[in-house]
Protein backbone atom coordinates (compact mmCIF):
# COMPACT_ATOMS: atom_id res chain seq x y z
CA UNK A 1 0.00 0.00 0.00
CA UNK A 2 1.42 3.38 -1.04
CA UNK A 3 1.04 6.27 1.39
CA UNK A 4 2.03 9.94 1.01
CA UNK A 5 5.25 10.85 2.81
CA UNK A 6 7.18 14.11 2.98
CA UNK A 7 10.95 14.49 2.72
CA UNK A 8 13.11 17.07 4.50
CA UNK A 9 12.54 19.56 1.66
CA UNK A 10 8.78 19.28 2.06
CA UNK A 11 8.35 17.35 -1.19
CA UNK A 12 5.70 14.64 -1.23
CA UNK A 13 6.48 11.06 -2.27
CA UNK A 14 4.34 7.94 -2.30
CA UNK A 15 6.10 5.15 -0.44
CA UNK A 16 5.19 1.72 0.83
CA UNK A 17 3.38 1.92 4.16
CA UNK A 18 3.61 -0.55 7.01
CA UNK A 19 3.25 -4.03 5.45
CA UNK A 20 0.01 -5.87 6.23
CA UNK A 21 2.11 -9.05 6.08
CA UNK A 22 5.79 -9.81 5.57
CA UNK A 23 5.02 -13.42 4.65
CA UNK A 24 1.92 -15.61 4.37
CA UNK A 25 1.75 -19.34 5.00
CA UNK A 26 -1.03 -21.92 4.65
CA UNK A 27 -1.14 -25.56 5.71
CA UNK A 28 0.55 -27.76 3.13
CA UNK A 29 3.20 -25.19 2.25
CA UNK A 30 6.83 -25.65 3.23
CA UNK A 31 7.97 -24.51 6.68
CA UNK A 32 11.43 -24.21 8.20
CA UNK A 33 12.18 -26.63 11.02
CA UNK A 34 12.42 -23.71 13.44
CA UNK A 35 9.02 -22.29 12.46
CA UNK A 36 7.44 -25.76 12.53
CA UNK A 37 8.73 -26.30 16.08
CA UNK A 38 7.36 -22.93 17.18
CA UNK A 39 3.90 -23.45 15.64
CA UNK A 40 3.72 -26.87 17.27
CA UNK A 41 4.30 -25.20 20.64
CA UNK A 42 1.57 -22.66 19.88
CA UNK A 43 -0.90 -25.40 18.94
CA UNK A 44 -0.47 -26.96 22.39
CA UNK A 45 -2.35 -24.01 23.90
CA UNK A 46 -4.85 -23.16 21.13
CA UNK A 47 -8.30 -24.76 20.89
CA UNK A 48 -7.68 -26.09 17.37
CA UNK A 49 -4.90 -26.47 14.82
CA UNK A 50 -3.36 -23.62 12.85
CA UNK A 51 -4.48 -23.44 9.23
CA UNK A 52 -2.58 -20.30 8.15
CA UNK A 53 -0.32 -17.52 9.41
CA UNK A 54 0.67 -14.00 8.45
CA UNK A 55 3.93 -12.44 9.63
CA UNK A 56 2.89 -9.04 11.01
CA UNK A 57 6.30 -8.09 12.41
CA UNK A 58 9.68 -9.79 12.14
CA UNK A 59 12.27 -7.41 13.57
CA UNK A 60 12.64 -7.18 17.36
CA UNK A 61 9.94 -9.81 17.91
CA UNK A 62 8.09 -12.22 15.67
CA UNK A 63 4.40 -11.30 15.60
CA UNK A 64 2.06 -13.67 13.79
CA UNK A 65 -1.60 -13.51 12.94
CA UNK A 66 -2.78 -17.12 13.14
CA UNK A 67 -6.04 -18.51 11.79
CA UNK A 68 -7.28 -21.70 13.44
CA UNK A 69 -9.36 -24.50 11.97
CA UNK A 70 -12.33 -23.37 14.07
CA UNK A 71 -12.20 -19.92 12.43
CA UNK A 72 -10.66 -18.00 15.32
CA UNK A 73 -8.03 -15.40 14.43
CA UNK A 74 -5.43 -14.71 17.13
CA UNK A 75 -2.13 -12.87 17.41
CA UNK A 76 1.01 -14.62 18.65
CA UNK A 77 4.01 -12.58 19.75
CA UNK A 78 7.30 -14.42 20.17
CA UNK A 79 10.25 -13.03 22.08
CA UNK A 80 13.33 -13.96 20.07
CA UNK A 81 15.91 -15.76 22.22
CA UNK A 82 19.38 -14.23 22.35
CA UNK A 83 22.29 -15.95 20.66
CA UNK A 84 24.75 -16.84 23.43
CA UNK A 85 24.58 -13.46 25.20
CA UNK A 86 23.36 -13.71 28.79
CA UNK A 87 23.03 -9.94 29.24
CA UNK A 88 20.93 -9.54 26.10
CA UNK A 89 18.84 -12.58 27.05
CA UNK A 90 18.07 -11.02 30.43
CA UNK A 91 17.05 -7.80 28.65
CA UNK A 92 14.78 -9.67 26.23
CA UNK A 93 13.17 -11.72 29.00
CA UNK A 94 12.71 -8.67 31.22
CA UNK A 95 10.88 -6.65 28.58
CA UNK A 96 8.72 -9.67 27.70
CA UNK A 97 7.65 -10.22 31.31
CA UNK A 98 7.11 -6.50 31.88
CA UNK A 99 4.93 -6.20 28.77
CA UNK A 100 2.81 -9.20 29.75
CA UNK A 101 2.24 -7.87 33.24
CA UNK A 102 1.43 -4.33 32.13
CA UNK A 103 -1.05 -5.43 29.45
CA UNK A 104 -2.88 -7.59 31.97
CA UNK A 105 -2.86 -4.74 34.49
CA UNK A 106 -4.15 -2.22 31.94
CA UNK A 107 -6.97 -4.53 30.88
CA UNK A 108 -8.10 -4.77 34.51
CA UNK A 109 -7.52 -1.15 35.53
CA UNK A 110 -8.20 1.01 32.47
CA UNK A 111 -10.31 1.45 29.36
CA UNK A 112 -7.27 1.57 27.10
CA UNK A 113 -7.85 -0.86 24.20
CA UNK A 114 -5.03 -3.36 24.70
CA UNK A 115 -5.22 -6.92 23.36
CA UNK A 116 -6.52 -9.52 25.81
CA UNK A 117 -3.88 -12.12 26.64
CA UNK A 118 -5.16 -15.69 26.29
CA UNK A 119 -1.98 -17.63 27.09
CA UNK A 120 1.60 -16.99 28.19
CA UNK A 121 4.32 -19.55 27.50
CA UNK A 122 7.91 -19.44 28.65
CA UNK A 123 10.87 -21.07 26.97
CA UNK A 124 11.41 -24.57 28.31
CA UNK A 125 10.35 -28.15 27.72
CA UNK A 126 7.09 -27.24 25.97
CA UNK A 127 8.26 -24.19 24.02
CA UNK A 128 11.42 -23.10 22.18
CA UNK A 129 10.75 -19.45 23.07
CA UNK A 130 8.74 -17.10 25.26
CA UNK A 131 5.46 -16.15 23.58
CA UNK A 132 2.00 -14.80 24.26
CA UNK A 133 -1.29 -15.47 22.50
CA UNK A 134 -3.56 -12.44 22.27
CA UNK A 135 -6.86 -11.36 20.83
CA UNK A 136 -6.74 -9.66 17.43
CA UNK A 137 -8.08 -6.11 17.65
CA UNK A 138 -10.02 -4.50 14.78
CA UNK A 139 -8.75 -1.61 12.68
CA UNK A 140 -5.76 -0.69 10.56
CA UNK A 141 -2.46 0.84 11.64
CA UNK A 142 -2.66 4.62 11.73
CA UNK A 143 0.45 4.94 9.57
CA UNK A 144 -1.43 3.46 6.63
CA UNK A 145 -4.79 5.03 7.43
CA UNK A 146 -4.00 8.63 8.37
CA UNK A 147 -3.88 10.02 4.84
CA UNK A 148 -7.22 8.32 4.05
CA UNK A 149 -9.04 9.99 6.94
CA UNK A 150 -11.01 13.16 6.38
CA UNK A 151 -9.85 16.33 8.14
CA UNK A 152 -12.68 15.89 10.62
CA UNK A 153 -11.74 12.24 11.24
CA UNK A 154 -8.10 13.21 11.88
CA UNK A 155 -9.19 15.65 14.57
CA UNK A 156 -11.60 13.05 15.94
CA UNK A 157 -8.72 10.56 16.15
CA UNK A 158 -6.77 13.06 18.28
CA UNK A 159 -9.79 13.59 20.50
CA UNK A 160 -10.35 9.85 20.81
CA UNK A 161 -6.67 9.27 21.56
CA UNK A 162 -6.72 11.80 24.38
CA UNK A 163 -10.15 11.67 25.95
CA UNK A 164 -11.54 8.16 25.57
CA UNK A 165 -8.69 5.78 25.17
CA UNK A 166 -5.09 6.39 26.05
CA UNK A 167 -3.28 9.60 26.77
CA UNK A 168 -5.33 11.23 29.51
CA UNK A 169 -6.12 7.91 31.14
CA UNK A 170 -2.42 7.03 31.32
CA UNK A 171 -1.88 10.47 32.82
CA UNK A 172 -4.32 9.74 35.66
CA UNK A 173 -3.59 6.09 36.50
CA UNK A 174 -2.30 5.47 40.02
CA UNK A 175 1.32 4.35 39.64
CA UNK A 176 4.43 4.29 41.86
CA UNK A 177 6.20 7.62 42.15
CA UNK A 178 9.62 6.50 40.95
CA UNK A 179 11.21 6.54 37.49
CA UNK A 180 11.66 3.21 35.71
CA UNK A 181 9.82 0.33 34.02
CA UNK A 182 6.92 -1.49 35.64
CA UNK A 183 7.00 -4.92 37.28
CA UNK A 184 4.31 -6.69 39.34
CA UNK A 185 4.08 -5.57 42.95
CA UNK A 186 4.51 -8.21 45.60
CA UNK A 187 2.16 -8.87 47.23
CA UNK A 188 -0.93 -7.58 45.45
CA UNK A 189 -2.16 -6.82 41.95
CA UNK A 190 -0.53 -3.41 41.55
CA UNK A 191 2.66 -2.19 39.93
CA UNK A 192 6.18 -1.76 41.21
CA UNK A 193 9.21 -0.27 39.46
CA UNK A 194 12.46 -1.74 38.17
CA UNK A 195 15.32 0.04 36.35
CA UNK A 196 14.13 1.41 33.01
CA UNK A 197 14.41 -0.99 30.08
CA UNK A 198 15.95 0.75 27.07
CA UNK A 199 15.22 0.11 23.39
CA UNK A 200 18.64 -1.52 23.28
CA UNK A 201 20.00 -3.46 26.23
CA UNK A 202 23.00 -1.11 26.38
CA UNK A 203 20.58 1.80 26.91
CA UNK A 204 18.87 0.32 29.96
CA UNK A 205 19.28 1.96 33.36
CA UNK A 206 21.12 0.28 36.21
CA UNK A 207 18.85 1.64 38.94
CA UNK A 208 15.48 3.23 39.66
CA UNK A 209 15.51 7.04 39.89
CA UNK A 210 13.78 9.12 42.53
CA UNK A 211 14.05 12.53 40.89
CA UNK A 212 13.91 14.16 37.48
CA UNK A 213 17.42 15.51 38.01
CA UNK A 214 18.83 12.01 38.59
CA UNK A 215 17.15 10.71 35.46
CA UNK A 216 18.46 13.54 33.27
CA UNK A 217 22.01 12.97 34.54
CA UNK A 218 21.61 9.31 33.57
CA UNK A 219 20.52 10.23 30.02
CA UNK A 220 23.47 12.59 29.54
CA UNK A 221 25.80 9.85 30.78
CA UNK A 222 24.35 7.40 28.25
CA UNK A 223 24.75 9.88 25.41
CA UNK A 224 28.41 10.48 26.24
CA UNK A 225 28.97 6.71 25.95
CA UNK A 226 26.91 6.33 22.77
CA UNK A 227 28.53 5.21 19.53
CA UNK A 228 26.32 7.72 17.72
CA UNK A 229 28.57 10.65 18.70
CA UNK A 230 31.55 9.18 16.82
CA UNK A 231 34.68 7.24 17.69
CA UNK A 232 37.48 9.70 16.93
CA UNK A 233 39.03 12.03 19.49
CA UNK A 234 37.91 15.13 17.59
CA UNK A 235 34.30 13.98 17.34
CA UNK A 236 34.21 13.02 21.01
CA UNK A 237 35.72 16.33 22.13
CA UNK A 238 33.14 18.29 20.11
CA UNK A 239 30.31 16.10 21.36
CA UNK A 240 31.36 16.38 25.02
CA UNK A 241 31.58 20.16 24.72
CA UNK A 242 28.10 20.38 23.18
CA UNK A 243 26.61 18.01 25.75
CA UNK A 244 28.16 19.92 28.64
CA UNK A 245 26.67 23.17 27.34
CA UNK A 246 23.28 21.54 26.92
CA UNK A 247 23.41 19.92 30.36
CA UNK A 248 24.12 23.31 31.94
CA UNK A 249 21.06 24.75 30.16
CA UNK A 250 18.94 21.81 31.31
CA UNK A 251 20.05 22.21 34.93
CA UNK A 252 18.94 25.84 34.87
CA UNK A 253 15.65 24.86 33.24
CA UNK A 254 14.96 22.16 35.84
CA UNK A 255 15.01 24.76 38.61
CA UNK A 256 11.97 26.40 37.01
CA UNK A 257 9.91 23.18 37.18
CA UNK A 258 8.75 23.63 40.76
CA UNK A 259 5.10 22.59 40.55
CA UNK A 260 4.47 19.10 42.04
CA UNK A 261 2.02 18.40 39.19
CA UNK A 262 4.88 18.68 36.67
CA UNK A 263 7.05 16.20 38.57
CA UNK A 264 4.32 13.71 39.45
CA UNK A 265 5.24 10.34 37.93
CA UNK A 266 3.01 9.10 35.11
CA UNK A 267 2.77 5.87 33.11
CA UNK A 268 3.76 6.31 29.47
CA UNK A 269 3.99 4.20 26.33
CA UNK A 270 7.57 4.75 25.15
CA UNK A 271 6.88 3.74 21.54
CA UNK A 272 3.51 5.34 20.78
CA UNK A 273 4.04 5.93 17.08
CA UNK A 274 1.60 5.54 14.22
CA UNK A 275 2.39 1.87 13.55
CA UNK A 276 1.38 0.94 17.11
CA UNK A 277 -2.08 2.52 16.98
CA UNK A 278 -5.10 0.98 15.26
CA UNK A 279 -7.98 3.09 13.93
CA UNK A 280 -11.22 2.57 12.05
CA UNK A 281 -12.40 4.62 9.05
CA UNK A 282 -13.98 7.23 11.33
CA UNK A 283 -10.85 7.88 13.39
CA UNK A 284 -11.87 5.79 16.40
CA UNK A 285 -8.84 4.36 18.18
CA UNK A 286 -9.45 0.60 18.24
CA UNK A 287 -6.14 -0.61 19.65
CA UNK A 288 -2.86 0.44 21.26
CA UNK A 289 -0.14 -2.14 20.67
CA UNK A 290 3.44 -3.07 21.60
CA UNK A 291 3.84 -2.21 25.27
CA UNK A 292 7.26 -3.83 25.64
CA UNK A 293 8.81 -0.36 25.93
CA UNK A 294 7.01 1.68 28.55
CA UNK A 295 8.01 3.56 31.65
CA UNK A 296 6.97 5.67 34.59
CA UNK A 297 8.35 9.19 34.20
CA UNK A 298 7.65 12.71 35.48
CA UNK A 299 4.65 14.34 33.81
CA UNK A 300 6.73 16.91 31.90
CA UNK A 301 8.39 14.00 30.07
CA UNK A 302 5.47 11.57 29.94
CA UNK A 303 3.09 13.86 28.04
CA UNK A 304 3.61 15.06 24.49
CA UNK A 305 2.22 15.73 21.06
CA UNK A 306 1.50 12.67 18.89
CA UNK A 307 4.79 11.41 17.48
CA UNK A 308 3.56 11.35 13.88
CA UNK A 309 2.93 15.11 13.98
CA UNK A 310 6.47 15.99 15.05
CA UNK A 311 8.65 18.44 13.15
CA UNK A 312 10.67 19.17 16.29
CA UNK A 313 14.13 18.29 17.64
CA UNK A 314 15.31 15.04 15.99
CA UNK A 315 12.42 15.35 13.52
CA UNK A 316 13.23 18.94 12.55
CA UNK A 317 13.96 18.63 8.79
CA UNK A 318 17.02 20.86 9.16
CA UNK A 319 18.71 18.47 11.57
CA UNK A 320 16.98 15.11 11.17
CA UNK A 321 18.77 11.97 10.06
CA UNK A 322 18.53 11.32 6.32
CA UNK A 323 16.43 8.22 7.07
CA UNK A 324 13.52 10.25 8.52
CA UNK A 325 10.27 10.68 6.59
CA UNK A 326 7.09 12.47 7.66
CA UNK A 327 3.58 11.08 7.15
CA UNK A 328 1.94 14.48 7.64
CA UNK A 329 2.84 17.73 5.88
CA UNK A 330 4.24 20.57 7.97
CA UNK A 331 1.25 22.91 7.76
CA UNK A 332 -1.21 20.13 8.55
CA UNK A 333 0.95 19.03 11.49
CA UNK A 334 0.90 22.58 12.89
CA UNK A 335 -2.90 22.69 12.70
CA UNK A 336 -3.36 19.22 14.19
CA UNK A 337 -0.94 20.00 17.03
CA UNK A 338 -2.92 23.16 17.74
CA UNK A 339 -6.12 21.10 17.84
CA UNK A 340 -4.47 18.56 20.14
CA UNK A 341 -3.38 21.30 22.56
CA UNK A 342 -6.89 22.76 22.59
CA UNK A 343 -8.46 19.36 23.30
CA UNK A 344 -6.23 18.53 26.26
CA UNK A 345 -6.47 22.06 27.65
CA UNK A 346 -10.24 21.69 27.91
CA UNK A 347 -10.18 18.13 29.24
CA UNK A 348 -7.24 18.20 31.67
CA UNK A 349 -5.50 21.47 32.49
CA UNK A 350 -2.65 19.76 34.35
CA UNK A 351 -1.86 17.69 31.26
CA UNK A 352 -1.83 20.85 29.16
CA UNK A 353 0.44 22.63 31.63
CA UNK A 354 2.89 19.70 31.51
CA UNK A 355 2.67 19.71 27.70
CA UNK A 356 3.70 23.37 27.63
CA UNK A 357 6.28 23.35 30.42
CA UNK A 358 8.02 20.20 29.19
CA UNK A 359 8.38 21.04 25.50
CA UNK A 360 12.07 21.98 25.71
CA UNK A 361 12.97 19.16 28.10
CA UNK A 362 11.25 16.50 25.98
CA UNK A 363 13.17 17.74 22.94
CA UNK A 364 16.41 17.36 24.88
CA UNK A 365 15.46 13.81 25.87
CA UNK A 366 14.70 12.94 22.24
CA UNK A 367 18.19 14.04 21.28
CA UNK A 368 19.81 12.17 24.15
CA UNK A 369 18.13 8.85 23.31
CA UNK A 370 18.51 9.22 19.52
CA UNK A 371 20.85 6.56 18.15
CA UNK A 372 21.14 7.89 14.59
CA UNK A 373 24.71 8.80 13.71
CA UNK A 374 25.65 12.33 14.80
CA UNK A 375 29.46 12.57 14.84
CA UNK A 376 30.55 15.37 17.11
CA UNK A 377 26.89 16.07 17.94
CA UNK A 378 26.84 18.50 15.01
CA UNK A 379 23.13 17.98 14.31
CA UNK A 380 22.35 18.46 17.99
CA UNK A 381 24.47 21.61 18.10
CA UNK A 382 22.65 23.03 15.07
CA UNK A 383 19.33 22.43 16.78
CA UNK A 384 20.55 24.10 19.98
CA UNK A 385 21.57 27.23 18.06
CA UNK A 386 18.19 27.36 16.30
CA UNK A 387 16.27 26.88 19.55
CA UNK A 388 18.10 29.72 21.26
CA UNK A 389 16.86 32.04 18.50
CA UNK A 390 13.26 30.92 19.08
CA UNK A 391 13.29 32.22 22.66
CA UNK A 392 10.01 32.07 24.52
CA UNK A 393 8.21 30.37 21.64
CA UNK A 394 9.80 27.10 22.84
CA UNK A 395 7.08 26.78 25.46
CA UNK A 396 4.10 28.06 23.48
CA UNK A 397 2.27 25.11 21.84
CA UNK A 398 -0.22 27.42 20.13
CA UNK A 399 2.56 29.43 18.47
CA UNK A 400 4.63 26.82 16.69
CA UNK A 401 7.40 28.43 14.67
CA UNK A 402 8.05 26.57 11.41
CA UNK A 403 11.61 25.91 10.34
CA UNK A 404 13.03 28.23 7.70
UniProtKB/Swiss-Prot annotation:
One Pfam family per UniProt: APH
Taxonomic superkingdom: Eukaryota
Function: Part of the gene cluster that mediates the biosynthesis of clavilactone A, a meroterpenoid that features a unique benzo-fused ten-membered carbocyclic ring unit with an alpha,beta-epoxy-gamma-lactone moiety, forming an intriguing 10/5/3 tricyclic nested skeleton. ClaR, ClaS and ClaT are sufficient to produce clavilactone A and the function of claY, if any, has still to be identified. The biosynthesis begins with the prenyltransferase claS that transfers geranyl pyrophosphate (GPP) to hydroquinone to produces geranylhydroquinon.
Protein name: Clavilactone A biosynthesis cluster protein Y
Organism (species): Ampulloclitocybe clavipes (Club foot)
